[in-house]
């Protein structure tokens, strides 16, 4: 039964994000765009080690200051900072670096597609790393496509920043994704659940929201493709 749940978790974590990637990739027929999408996926798949590296830096801070011995506070640091913040920083950095490195007349929708694709690659890579995790955790993350949702929000905010020159939406989108990610992980921590099992409802609720948001992403893609505000190349 456990093996079946693990297999189900892997499939569930792959199918929605792969479908989203295909949908984004097929927005344009031009070879240059499809090449960018392929490269963005590769960057995402290879981004897990960079995430582990930054988490390692935060882990050193955790050890030096004995944060891991601070009970619930230590668990909050581990889940919200060491894991969630490190991963969101790495994915966002690699996404922005990618768009700077590869010259292309990006539209707002292009930036959303590239940014989401980088996180899709990260999500697929992480699902392989998480093979030893609790099956229920894999199922929750798989059904809700958490990283894809985080990446979409950040990419939308970055695209808004590039479109308007106003950085606040980008900052708010990053903070939203980080807290969404961090609180989800923290809600499943042993230290918090030891106080009351009902705290698991926090993570379940955030996973349900992510599932609903994943559906919204699939609705958003074809609608945005018909709007000039999203498809017109950004000139700054």
Sequence positions of predicted segments:
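Hydrophobic alpha-helical segments at protein termini of multi-pass membrane proteins
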Residues: 1-236
């Amino acid at each position: 039964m456990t093996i079946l749940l693990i297999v189900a978790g892997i499939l569930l974590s792959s199918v929605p994000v792969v479908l989203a990637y295909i949908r984004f990739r097929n927005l344009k027929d031009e070879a240059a765009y499809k090449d960018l999408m392929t490269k963005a996926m590769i960057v995402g798949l290879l981004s897990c080690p960079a995430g582990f590296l930054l988490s390692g830096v935060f882990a050193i801070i955790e050890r030096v200051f004995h944060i891991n011995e601070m009970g619930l506070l230590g668990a909050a640091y581990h889940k919200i900072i060491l894991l969630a913040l490190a991963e969101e920083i790495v994915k966002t950095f690699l996404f922005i670096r990618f768009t700077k490195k590869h010259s292309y007349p990006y539209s707002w929708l292009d930036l959303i597609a590239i940014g989401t694709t980088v996180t899709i690659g990260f999500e697929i890579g992480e699902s392989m790393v998480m093979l030893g995790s609790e099956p229920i955790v894999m199922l929750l993350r798989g059904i809700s496509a958490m990283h894809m949702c985080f990446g979409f929000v950040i990419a939308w905010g970055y695209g808004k920043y590039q479109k308007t020159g106003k950085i606040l939406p980008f900052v708010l989108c990053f903070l939203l994704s980080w807290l969404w990610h961090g609180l989800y992980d923290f809600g499943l921590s042993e230290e918090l659940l030891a106080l009351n099992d009902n705290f698991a409802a926090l993570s379940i609720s955030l996973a349900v929201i992510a599932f609903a948001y994943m559906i919204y992403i699939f609705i958003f893609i074809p609608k945005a493709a018909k709007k000039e505000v999203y498809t017109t190349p950004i000139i700054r």
